[in-house]
Amino acid sequence: MASSSPLVDLVQLIARSLVDQPDQVVVREVPGDRFPRIELTVAREDIGKVIGKDGRTAQSIRTVLNAAASKAGRRAHLDILD
């Protein structure tokens, strides 16, 4: 089993704590042109829990992700896939 990046682990931990079906959470890192994209996929019925009212939960996850990436001298972008 390949080890995942700390950013992937962080998003996975946050997402699994928010959803009703944590076993359906899939997080992967995709190389980008300037910085990596972190792709988050959850069960269809949990997508609203991850996005939140007016996108506030998603924005909060992105803020934590960017803070962690910045501390490591990196940048990252979170995509929530449906």
Predicted regions mapped to residue ranges:
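RNA-contacting regions in translation and RNA-metabolism proteins
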Residues: 1-49, 60-82
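Glycine-centered tight-turn and secondary-structure capping sites
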Residues: 51-55
